[in-house]
Each structure stands twice: as structure tokens, then as C-alpha cells.
Amino acid sequence: MRKVDGLMKVLREAHCSPCLFLEQVTGTHWVGVEFLKHLPADWKCVHRDAVRFCEAVHQAGCGRIDLMPETICCEGARRAFGWMKNRNETLVQHLSEKTGVSSDRARELVERVPVLADPCAGVRVGDCTHADVLVTYVRPEAAMRLVRLWETATGRSLHVDISSIMAVCGNAVVKAYISQSISI
């Protein structure tokens, strides 16, 4: 049985979309993220400037954003989405210089961040209709309500690892997609 079966049952019984249900539970706006294997006919990669994925999630509250490797300016997100292979050392050096942690520690942190096994053709952010992952920025009270929903639906406590390294792209969205569990 998948970890999310109990939660999916709760969502089905609510008779509304997962996005709407989670918005009602947490009081926050949720954004869908869809990993596309092929670019659809309605693909509109019109983002003028390259953007960080975490910024796109925030901006998607105003409308859908379609992303490709060349429209994401963050190498961490490109790595998490499987678009950047064999470039960990670039990220390690950047992290070490930016934070002051040793290269060895930076390497450990970078290598722990999940990566999509099969790179996607594009990432659609903002549309909840066919979302692979739902994401939001929550306040503490909303986070507590969400965790309580998880515990009630699954009968288990939520165990999470939290990291500031590629926090939204890799350690939240890709990790949730791979594990089929809540990531923070």
C-alpha cells in the first residue's frame, strides 16, 4: 500500500479537487507542479527572463508558468529536474563559497538532494489539474493542520528531513514526487 492511499481516500471523500481541499485545510494557496515527458500543444514557454524555480512557484499564483532548462537560472533546480548531469562540483563550489561550509560537507549536502531519474521535457507550474505535486508556502499553524491531516489519514506520524539546499526544487517538490509523501 502506498503511503498516500489514506490521504487520497480523504481527498476523494471531500468531493473536491486536491488543491481546493488543501486550501480549505491550510488556508493557503496551493500551486500544482507537473513534470512533462513531452511538451504539449498548448506549451507556452513565454517567461521572458530566466527564473529560479522557487520564484516561479511564488509567481504561479498569478497564472501558469511553463519552464524548460533554458528558462531556469538556478543550477540546483536544473540538477533536481535531471537537466544537468555530472555538474555536482560546480554546485559544491558555489555552496561552499556562499555558505562557508567545507567542500566535503557541501558535496554531502548536494548529493543528498533528490534528482528525477528520468529528465522531463518541461515543468508546468501553477495548474493543479494534472499536477504531480502540490506545493505551498505555509505558516506554522497551516503546517500543523496539514501534518494533522496526514496523521489522521495515514495513521502514522510524519517523518521529514529538512534542508536549505535546493529547498523547494529538490528537497520539497522532487522529493515529494519520488517518495509520494509530504516534503518540507
Give the location of each predicted region:
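Acidic, serine/proline-rich low-complexity intrinsically disordered regions
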Residues: 2-184
